[in-house]
């Protein structure tokens, strides 16, 4: 972030090649992410390295085979960040995926519009019941399975 910053792992949630920008999602928990929270539109990091790690295994699979599968993604809180680019990639390749995203409250739910735009079915969950399914994401998975949904990839 600056000359005194540390290297921390962050998920690249989205990008805009034309604008030369990336979108990252984080929760302020330490010194670096707390500093990052103070940045405004147009601010920048002194240094950014990435992407690091491995791509989703889904990118290695045959698209036509993926289209035959019933795929479910489940994430909660900032765990929605790594779900979105995978679901978006599938959507761009004509593959539907269902998505369950949870948070403590409606106000803490992230990437909702983005998920709705690329999901086959989108199921928001809130622990406090303020929006969508009341309860944990795991109870939504159970409910879908009890209703007869079968998933090949989860």
Residue ranges and their predicted role:
Residues 33-154:
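FNR/FR-type flavoprotein reductase catalytic core
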Residues 1-41:
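Ferredoxin-reductase
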């Amino acid at each position: 972030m600056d000359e005194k910053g540390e290297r921390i792992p962050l998920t690249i949630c989205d990008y805009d090649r034309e604008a030369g920008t990336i979108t990252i999602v984080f929760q302020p928990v330490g010194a670096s992410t707390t500093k990052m929270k103070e940045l405004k539109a147009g601010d920048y990091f002194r240094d950014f390295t990435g992407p690091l790690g491995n791509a989703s295994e889904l990118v290695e699979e045959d698209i036509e085979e993926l289209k035959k599968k019933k795929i479910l993604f489940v994430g909660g809180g900032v765990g929605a960040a790594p779900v979105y680019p995978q679901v978006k990639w599938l959507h761009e390749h004509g593959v539907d995926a269902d998505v369950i995203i949870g948070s403590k409250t409606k106000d803490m739910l992230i990437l909702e519009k983005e998920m709705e735009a690329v999901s086959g079915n989108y199921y928001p969950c809130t622990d406090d019941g303020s929006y969508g399914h009341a309860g944990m994401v795991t109870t939504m998975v159970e409910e879908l399975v009890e209703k007869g949904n079968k998933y090949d990839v989860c």
